[in-house]
Amino acid sequence: MKILIIGAGGHVGGAAASALDAHEVIRASRSGDHAVDVSDPESIERLFTDVGTVDAVVVAVGSVPFAPLADLGRDDYESAFRSKVLAQLDVVRLGVDRVSDRGSFTLTTGILAREPIATGAAASLANGALESYVMAAATELPRGIRINAVSPSVLEDAPSYFSAFPGFVPVSTHRVGQAYVKSVLGVQTGQVFRVD
């Protein structure tokens, strides 16, 4: 199976790449052999032109601002939406014709869609929007193409985030990687695979 992983250089994308490495994995990120800027639709188009038809696409990108609710302005919410939501939606929108019949997309959300933390309102907004999109898009994608999301908690190998997630039990990259395996190799669509 030929699998494109966008964001393979990060903790979460790296977990997906490691778990799927028995397949032909094409790693894309801001730098490297397959460079892509997911905030630029033309860059996404170039990536798909370069790699050709794929069987599955995993997207693990998106940064969001963390700040107290009173300090978040419209620009912060727009930034979160552009970086986390629109970037992943553009990959689906521009890549749907480059995914084989009965292929799949797997997007990445996060625990803040369902479990709030202080300073996390923009992240909660973006993650919730992506999860709703996955549910809706699953009913309309052509040619039997599936779409799911993986929604992990804070990762064990990202201790710099632990203080922002008090009481949250960190999850292993192995478990996160297996959620991507389930999405890519399974049969479900319109699902959010929670890892917490």
PLM-predicted stretches and their roles:
Residues 43, 86-94:
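Conserved mid-core alpha-helix of short-chain dehydrogenase/reductase
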Residues 98, 115, 136-145, 187:
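Active-site-adjacent segment of SDR/Rossmann-fold oxidoreductases
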Residues 28-43:
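Rossmann-fold cofactor-recognition segment
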Residues 6, 54-63, 107, 148:
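Rossmann-fold scaffold of SDR-type NAD(P)-dependent oxidoreductases
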Residues 63-78:
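Conserved mid-core segment of classical short-chain dehydrogenase/reductases
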Residues 68, 80-81, 87-90, 102-130, ...:
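Catalytic loop of short-chain dehydrogenase/reductase
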Residues 4-19:
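N-terminal Rossmann NAD(P)H-binding glycine-rich loop of SDR-like oxidoreductase domains
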